[in-house]
Amino acid sequence: MSLNPVIVGGGPAGMAAAIELAEHGVRSTLIEEASRLGGVVYRGPLRDGVQLDYLGPRYCEMLAKLHGDFADHEQMIDVRLNSRVVGAEGTQSLVLLDGEEQVQQVSYEQLILAAGCHERSVPFPGWTLPGVKLLGGLQLQIKSGVVKPQSPVVIAGTGPLLPLVACQLHASGVRVAGVYEACALGKIAKQSLAMLNKPQLFLDGLSMLAYLKLHGIALRYGWGVVEAQGQDALSVVTVAPYSSDWQPDMAKAQRIAAQTLAVGYGFIPRTQLSQQMGLEHNFSDDGYLRASANAWQQSSEPHVHLAGDMGGIRGGEAAMLSGRIAALSILMQRGVLSNEAALQRRQGYERKLASILRFRGAVDRYTARGAGQVELPKGDTVICRCEHTTRNDIERALSQGVQDMASLKMRTRVSMGDCQGRMCVGYCSDRLRQATGRKDVGWIRPRFPLDPIPFSAFPPSDQEVSQHD
């Protein structure tokens, strides 16, 4: 085989896959849209010399190890930073917008898609105000070591990322006004035994809770955001206790002064490219679309592999293991490893992965979102920020008989902006599933290009050149 395996995505999954290939003497091409490798989890500071001690010693150790391992094998990896894959031509080549903003075609014989995920946006009144941010984006901001959010900060949502970011913000010098976990404490406690599958992560969680208590940062379980208010920017956040299905009790609502509100309700796999390639997909219990893969991380096209969050949200450590398994499949396809040798290594990775998946299952169960979340937006709340589609528009379409995402798109123009539904697909899917009682209501279908391409990216035609001579 003459062409390098191509890896799309330079996060932990893509980096681990490239390392595994390099360890066996196989060169690869790694395409990453950011200016640094590592993804959202392990990208590190944007400037050299910036210390990230406030992120904790264990994180800094894992960050250094991943980048150190990669540096040891970098001579075997063709790294293309600031390069975006904007489309696919079948399952043999990709269309790339490179760092010079020129369109290129990249052919491959084997491909690993490790495109990661994006945050689930949950609309509520005031969510478009300046100062309201997604939690993962806020964490990436402090990980960059360059810019910190304005204080005080309120954190709301569900999941282990809430206390983690609260601790990191406080340690970096940012004032945290409170953390509001939508799930009740009892629901989390029921999953404590399963979470012991990863003892260190469980202990890390307890350590974070102790840190918040020591520094007087309120962590309230069974509470969530109701509304964000302000004139030109955020100034007040309204929170309230939630019922078991996340219905807010407005009689007990509280208003909190804040300049930043960070909301985090989990993540959704980035399947735009895998959809465009025509690969098979399925729906998770949480309602998001994910690409289907077998035990070798092979998609419905055996030479196209999936790694990391493409097949489901499982975290950075699991992403690295899935990337290595995908690389083993390629090594087997290229005849570098025998089936027996590849299987033996895969089983070793799977043993590590099993405990992570049991831990992750517990997290997924306690962070399961309640039906009341869909009712948070008022009628005039914007759902699709690109097309200014409101909840009233969506409710009108449902009353007219809309049953799936494609019909909703035609009636309301949701997802027709540049982001292609990344911001609104979660809510639209939730509302359609609630209204129809169906698990599969379709998904936003991506269109080419996946990201905008400047006109300057295209070379002038011969006719245009002759007209200017």
Curated annotation (Swiss-Prot):
One of its GO terms (molecular function) is glycine dehydrogenase (cyanide-forming) activity. Keywords: Cell membrane, Membrane, Oxidoreductase. One of its GO terms (cellular component) is plasma membrane. The keyword Membrane applies. It is found in: Cell membrane. Induction: Transcriptionally up-regulated by Anr in response to Fe(3+) in oxygen-limiting conditions. Stimulated by glycine. It catalyses: glycine + 2 A = hydrogen cyanide + 2 AH2 + CO2. Pfam families: Fer2_BFD, Pyr_redox_2. The keyword Cell membrane applies. Its EC number is 1.4.99.5. Heterotrimer of HcnA, HcnB and HcnC. A three-component membrane-bound flavoenzyme that catalyzes the formation of hydrogen cyanide, a secondary metabolite, by transfer of electrons to a cyanide-resistant branch of the aerobic respiratory chain. Contributes to suppression of black root rot of tobacco. PANTHER family: ANAEROBIC GLYCEROL-3-PHOSPHATE DEHYDROGENASE SUBUNIT B (PTHR42949:SF3). This is Hydrogen cyanide synthase subunit HcnB. It comes from Pseudomonas protegens (strain DSM 19095 / LMG 27888 / CFBP 6595 / CHA0).
